[in-house]
Structures are given as C-alpha cells and as structure tokens.
Amino acid sequence: MTKTITLEGLADQVQAQASTLSTLLAEANLPSPSFGPDAPPAPPHGKEFEKIQAARMALIESANAIRDLALGPEDCITAFSDGIKHDLAALHVIVDFNIPELVPLHGEVSYAEIAQKVGFPEYRVHRILRHAMTSRIFREPRPGYVAHTGPSAAFLRNPVLRDWVSFNLDEVWKADTKLVETLRTCGDSEEPADSAIGRAFGFAPGKTYWDFIANDGEGENKGWRQRRFAQGMKCRAAGNPQTHHHLHSAFDWAGLGKATVIDVGGSAGHVSIELAKAFPDLEFVVQDFEGLKSFHDGVPDELKSRISFEAQDILQPNAHPNADVYLLRSILHDWSDKYAVLILKNLVPALKDGARVLIADFIGPENTQSGPMWLERLSTIRSMQMMTMVNAPERSEKDWINVVKRADSRYSVKAVVTPAGTAMSVIEIVFNASA
C-alpha cells in the first residue's frame, strides 16, 4: 500500500530536519545557510561532513515534496513549461553581459548604471533582473537599485561558475531544442554526430562534440569553447555533489606508496592538483587535447615537479606505459557503449600486470526512485545531458561491469565504492596480464 503523504506530515519532517541540520552546522562551527551575499557558495565537503550532507539531502527532499504537493498536479507542470525557459533566458543575459561584476558585493547600483554599461535600455534591464530576483538572483534593496544575494554573489566568489553556466546555456540549451527532432530521425544511433547537439550545430559525419569545441573560432580565438569547458569543469569538480573529494576516500591512494597516476582526459588538471596536495608520494600525468596544454601553467609552483601534461587522443592507444593507476574521472559517461569499450581497450597496450584502472563516474539506479528523489534528479540531469550532448547512455552498475568485460577479459572489477554525500562512484579495476 502506498503511504499517504500529507502537508502536515511533510511540514513536521521539514521542521525536524531543519533543526537537525542547524544543530550539526553549529556543532561543526559552520555558518547557517543564508540568502545574503556572504553566504558560503557551496556546502561543506569531505568525510567529516557526511552527517551534514545526509541531513541536507533529507531536508531538500522534504522541502521539494511539500512545495510540489502545495502546487498541485497542473501547477507542477506549468511551473516548468511557463517559467523555466524564461529563468534560463534571464540567467543567460546575466552571465553573457557579466552583470554580477557590475554590482558591488556589499553595496548597490542603479538599473540605469547597469543599462549604461551593458548597452541596452534600462527598462529591459529592469524586466530581466526583476524576473531573476524571483529565483533569488539579486535583490532590490530600494526602488531603482540592485544588490547581491548569495546566488548572484557566487559568480564573484567562484569566477569559473560563469564558464559552467555559459557552456550550459550557449550549447546544452540549444541542443535540448533539437532533442525531439533527433529522436525522430536517429534515435537508435550510437554515433556522436547523431546527437542533439550535433544536429543543433551541424556536425559533419564522424565528428564529435570534442572536435567541435577544439576547432570552433578563428586565429587566437580558435578553441575558445574548449577553454571555457575546461574552466567550467573546474567549477563542477569543486562543487557538490560530484566533488573531487569523493576520490580521496573511495580508493587507497596512500597505499600505493610512490606511484604514477595517469589522469586520462584530465582537462585542466584540477583533479590531479587536489590529489597531489593530499598524497605527496604520487606523481601525475594529465592527458588531454593539445589545446589544453597551456593550462599546465596554472598548476601551483610547489606541485609542478609532480604534475605534467601529455597530449593524448583517448580514441587512440594510450602512449604512456607502465603507470600504476589510470584514472578516468567523468570520461566514459561522455561516450556510447561502443566508444566506452574502445577507450578501455586503448588502455590495454600501456598496462602492466596489476595496474589499476579507476572509473570515477555516475552509476544509475537499477530501478527508478530507488533513493531520495533529489539525489536521483542529479543523476537523471546528468543522464539527459549525456544523451543530448554526446549520445551516451546512463549506466547502472550492471551496465558498467558489462562495458568493462566487453573491453578485455583481463580486466577484473575489484570494488565499486560510492562515498556518502556524493552522486559519484568509483569502480576499481585490476588488470591481470596473465588471465
């Protein structure tokens, strides 16, 4: 029998869960949540904050449920269809014109001053920002003036947030508008060019999203999308719940002793940097497109002797043999099964006996609604993004293991670990050369 959910019952849950979260934050000497500009831009991460993460998730789940129940069936639908497209449009204007930079962190600025700097009429600035304010992005401290809130100030506190949002609104949003058309014409294809973004931007047969972002633009501007994507990934790597911190506890890095880790498709090296800080015996080689080599300049001076960069096409055999660990963090979810198997095959020529391959990625549930809906939504958002952008599927644990088996019989899955407070899992694979 389905349990009856009531407003009163949910309200009691929200009150109890809010009290629990507040108590845990106070015990950890952490500030209470706030809409003010000085609010922490992200919740605390790490194993020591697992109870806080669990309490936060429970509260979000109940708060979302009471909102949806109060809305009712039709308003639940129209809240999406009527509002979200304009929410995205307002946010797109805000990031494209870099409006957060025009507002002092602890002051105010007039709509007229913003209009003068962005170059379009004040009445349009007013309409766009007033709509954003209904999502707590900026506030109006007095008529005619704009001030920061926590969400709008997050762009100042974490500049790469703008890159991540711009990528989603410039590219993913456009691709989403082509999803229905794509499903009608090539819904069963595993080819990257047959994705929704391939249709939105006119990819040639055989071309991938990665080809597109590496080559778009002319002269010095060539590859600007690739550079923006790399910066955006820094934002997601530092944010919850797919933070790189889950890697610290999901695998025994210290137990490797002095070892070499290949960060396959490691972008700007943000994950290698954090792991290098935590594990001083490890050396890292970041592999990615040649165009990202300049990001090595951003490696802290004290780590440059332990972090290097190599150009590597993951669709070709890996050129760095005999390392101890090959890390694929948020890589294979970008590819259909056909290509995920190929990428794992391409590691084999480089692997020594006993080498580890770590797949750090999202594992979809075997069944829908197998956990908190808020956490499941994070998984399905990722799944939709991968389908739209790269024609890749969501994979359950069984699906992931099947991909590994298809790649090479000498691969053996040793462990699958999902740290508390994260939507990411780590699949540890051992290569047995004599198997």
UniProtKB/Swiss-Prot annotation:
Catalytic center residues: H333 (proton acceptor)
The entry's keywords: Methyltransferase, S-adenosyl-L-methionine, Transferase
InterPro entries: COMT-like, O_MeTrfase_dom, SAM-dependent_MTases_sf, WH-like_DNA-bd_sf, WH_DNA-bd_sf
Gene induction: Expression is positively regulated by the azaterrilone A cluster-specific transcription factor tazR.
Gene3D superfamilies from the UniProt entry: Vaccinia Virus protein VP39, Winged helix-like DNA-binding domain superfamily/Winged helix DNA-binding domain
Pfam families reported for this sequence: Methyltransf_2
Amino-acid positions noted as binding S-adenosyl-L-methionine in the UniProt annotation, renumbered to this chain: D288
One example of a Gene Ontology biological process annotation: methylation
Top EC class for this record: transferase
Assigned EC number: 2.1.1.-
GO function terms (MF aspect): O-methyltransferase activity
Pathway: Secondary metabolite biosynthesis
Family classification: Belongs to the class I-like SAM-binding methyltransferase superfamily. Cation-independent O-methyltransferase family.
Function: O-methyltransferase; part of the gene cluster that mediates the biosynthesis of azaterrilone A and other azaphilones, a class of fungal metabolites characterized by a highly oxygenated pyrano-quinone bicyclic core and exhibiting a broad range of bioactivities. The first step of the pathway begins with the non-reducing polyketide synthase tazA that assembles one acetyl-CoA starter unit, five malonyl-CoA units, and catalyzes a series of Claisen condensations, methylation, PT-mediated cyclization, and finally releases the first hexaketide precursor through the R-domain.
PANTHER family linked to this entry: O-METHYLTRANSFERASE ASQN-RELATED (PTHR43712:SF5), PUTATIVE (AFU_ORTHOLOGUE AFUA_4G14580)-RELATED (PTHR43712)
Official protein name in the record: O-methyltransferase tazO
Native species: Aspergillus terreus (strain NIH 2624 / FGSC A1156)
Gene of this entry: tazO
